[in-house]
A protein has these predicted regions:
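A short, Lys/Arg-rich alpha-helix, primarily the initiator
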Residues: 1-12, 51
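DNA major-groove recognition helix of helix-turn-helix/homeodomain DNA-binding modules
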Residues: 44-60
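Non-catalytic, surface-exposed connector residues within folded enzymatic/regulatory domains
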Residues: 1, 43-44
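Short alpha-helical DNA-recognition segment
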Residues: 17-33
Length: 60
């Protein structure tokens, strides 16, 4: 699975839209949009950190 697909799946698992998700992580909306569209590549380390934060939030 490509990183952009993992990012989309992660966002959808939170129930947030693109704007909410990008604001939650402090990422400019345009950057996030480019990641999801595949125009730019999301750094893998950043995706893993976002996954970790989402997982920790669900546990609390």
């Amino acid at each position: 699975m490509e990183l952009k697909e993992e990012l989309i799946r992660l966002r959808e698992s939170t129930g947030m839209n693109k704007k909410q998700f990008s604001e939650y992580f402090g990422i400019p909306y345009r950057t996030f949009q480019d990641w999801e569209l595949g125009n730019r590549r999301v750094p893998e380390y950043l995706l893993r950190l976002m996954e970790y934060k989402v997982r920790m939030e669900k546990l609390n």
